[in-house]
Amino acid sequence: MTRPLRLHPDRLFPADAGTRDIARRLYGSVKDLPIISPHGHTDPEWFAGDAPFPDATNLFLAPDHYLYRMLYSQGVPLDRLGVPSKAGPSPADPREAWRMLASNMHLFRGTPSSMWLNHVFGEVFGFEIELSAETADLYFDRIGEALQSPAFRPRALFERFNIELLATTESPTDDLRHHKAMRASGWKGRVVTAYRPDPVIDAEHEDFRASLSRFGELTGQDVESWSGYLQAHRMRRAAFMEMGATSTDHGHPTAATADLSLADAEALFRKLLSADFSPADAELFRAQMLTEMARMSLDDGLVMQIHPGSFRNHNAGLFARYGRDKGADIPTRTDYVRALKPLLDRFGNERGLSVIVFTLDESSYARELAPLAGHYPVLKLGPAWWFHDSPEGMRRFREQTTETAGFYNTVGFNDDTRAFLSIPARHDVARRIDAGFLARLVAEHRLSEDDAHETAVDLAYNLPKRAYKLDEPARTPAAA
C-alpha cells in the first residue's frame, strides 16, 4: 500500500503553540534567503560540463555515504548499491540498486537522511507518495525522465536552488581544470574551490609519496627540501585563490598543533621522506603543518578550517576494496585546549587570521570550544558537523555554545555534502532549527523578537559570508 508523502509546514518547530508561532515568523524572514554553501564536497565537473545526471542511483545513492553506510550496517553489500570500488565502476544495475534503497527506506526513520530525501522528492521532483518497494520503479522512471530535461541540469538546479555561492574542496595536486572551465564558459554561477592539503601533509596517507611527486610537478619546486615544499604550498594556494578560494580545510586525526624551530622542522621533514618514521612523527608533522598553514594564511588571507577527530577508514577490509569515504569513519574524543595551544601561543591574538574549528566530539562544546572561541580573536566555531548535522545535533550545538561564545563567534551553517540535491533541504533544516531556538529565547523573554529576526538572518546568510570573507577583495600574497 502506498503512503502519501507529507512535508508538514511546521516540521521541526517547537511543540508549544505560542513558541511555534514565533518560530514561524522567524523562519518566514529567512526561508527564501539565498544559500551560502562555503564548505562542501560536490564535484566541480558537474557544473563545468553541465551534463545531465544519469539516473536516480547515481544522483542520490552512489555519492552519499550517509545512505549506503546505513544499508551496509544491515548487511547490504556496497557492490549492490552502485558504489564504485578501487577496481572500477560498480557492476550493479542502477535500477536494482534503487530498488534496494526503496525497499529499505524504513531504516532511515528518524534520521536526517529521511528528512533530506523527502524534501528533495517532494519539493524538487513533485512526488506525492513515499518511496517504497512498491513505488521504486515509478520513482526511478520519473526521476530519470526529469533528469533529461534542461531544467534538471546541474547549472539550472544551482540557479533554481537560489545558491549564491558554493565551495568545492580539492587537493593541492588537482589541476583545477573544472574550475577553469567554469570560468571560461561565462556561466554566472559562483562556484569556488578550497585548499585541502591533507594528501601532501599526512605521511600516513596511502598516496602520500605519489601526491608529493605530483605536487612537485605542478609547482616546479623541489618538494623534498623544506623550503621548496613550503614554497609549493604557497604557489598552489595562490592558484586556488585565482579560482575563487577563500579558505583552506584540514581533516587531521586530531587538533594537535606544534611550533618547531626551523632546524627541527627540517629534520622532521627529512625523516618523513626517508619512510623511517613513527606514527608519532607523522602526528607531529601534521601538527607543525597546521601552524605553517596559519602562517601562510596571515600572508594570503585564506580562512583556515580544522575538521579533526575522525578515525578514518575504521573498516580495514572495506578500505582495501573500496578506498576512502565509504561510510566507515568513526568519531573520536578530541582535545582542543592543549592541542591548539602552540598555534594560539604564536598566532592567537592576530586580527588578520581566522581559524574555524569543528568537532565530532560534542563533549567539547561547552568545556573547550565555546570558551576558546569566546576568548581568542582568531577562533570561530564551525556548525554541528557530519554525525551531528541533525536536528538534535544542531540544537545541542546552540544550547552548549551560545551562553559562552554567543552567536557571533559562530559561522552560520555548512552543508558539507557530496549530495548536491540535498543542499536546499539541509539549509532549510538549519534555518528551522535556529528559528525554533531563537523562538524559545523570545518566549522566555531573554531576547526581543526584533533581535531574534536580525540574528536569524545573520545565522542564515550574513555570518557565513563574513566568516569566509566572501565579500572581500582577493588579497595578493606576500612574496616568499
Swiss-Prot record:
One of its GO terms (biological process) is D-glucuronate catabolic process. It catalyses: D-glucuronate = D-fructuronate; aldehydo-D-galacturonate = keto-D-tagaturonate. Keywords: Isomerase. SUPFAM superfamilies: Metallo-dependent hydrolases. InterPro entries: Metal_Hydrolase (IPR032466), Uronate_isomerase (IPR003766). Its EC number is 5.3.1.12. It is an enzyme of class 5 (isomerase). One of its GO terms (molecular function) is glucuronate isomerase activity. It holds the Pfam family UxaC. Pathway: Carbohydrate metabolism; pentose and glucuronate interconversion. Belongs to the metallo-dependent hydrolases superfamily. Uronate isomerase family. HAMAP family: UxaC. PANTHER family: URONATE ISOMERASE. This is Uronate isomerase. It comes from Phenylobacterium zucineum (strain HLK1).
